[in-house]
Amino acid sequence: MKLIAIVSVLVLAIGASNAKSLRASSITDAELLTVSKDLHTGDVNGAVVTLDLQSQTAAGSMADVAPGPIIVSDPLADFAKPTFAAFQALLNNYQKNVTIQDTFTPEQLAEEVAFIDAVMETSVMQSLHTFLVSKGEASADVAVFKQFLSTIWFGRWSEYVAGVVASSGWEHTNVFERLEDNTIVGYHSWIYLYNEQEDGDFNYLGYIETLDTGKTTVVSMPVDLYGSTKAFTQFNFGASPELELALGTLCFVARPDLACVVSGSNGAAYNWDTHTVTYNGVQYVESSHPVFEPHL
């Protein structure tokens, strides 16, 4: 599949999805819990990550109550797995300032295609695709489904600065974007956090809440990154790239901009928020991340 073909073909595919978003999803709350638990359980590529949470802090506090790093194990062996490697290849492709327009080389666009190809080779994404097809929420054609994923996650949109197309859902979620007041938005990838921790650019301040999902650990915390701050963000430590993409895609289809209650492999329920943005008539992922306190 070539990304160049996505531009023309996918307008129709995403248009059909947008039409669906105007009606109630066929996916029930019980089905969300079941399929998300299966996705967590089947995440065979997930990493075993050891955390040193240290001291608890409060939402809104930027006081540093944690002298050490949060990740104290070495996940580099996991980072060599195909989906992790494809994920890492994307991280340096983005302008992190919302005032600067993103531009991409053919090689960088090919890395986006390679990432979608890699995750679709996993049982997690294949299980998600099978489920969505069974509910009439996705095409059975794998190529069409890949194109759908590419558009909702990598399609570019403008929101923060008029006329500047500086964002995508994948960038916003997995990297971050710096606003004009030096605060940051997005930033939900534990993989990217680890990279910045190792480079000395991320200062762990302490945790607000934690949740054990069986295979991953959800943590909310304030962020101090490159001297820019965010008062509250969330990470799903240990999750593979395909699990996070699957959960975000599931909630984009089933509960866009609504409470999307999912289940960990141990049955722990929590919200997965997939916020959307509509740009030039097309609906995209804006951000995708876990939150606490499920609204059942």
Give the predicted meaning of each segment.
Residues M1-L3, H295-L296:
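A positional/structural detector of protein chain ends, strongest at the extreme C-terminus
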Residues K2-A19:
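Cleavable N-terminal signal peptides of Sec/SRP-targeted secreted and luminal proteins
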Residues P241-L296:
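Compact beta-sheet-dominated globular domain cores
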Residues K20-G264:
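N-terminal "domain-start" segment
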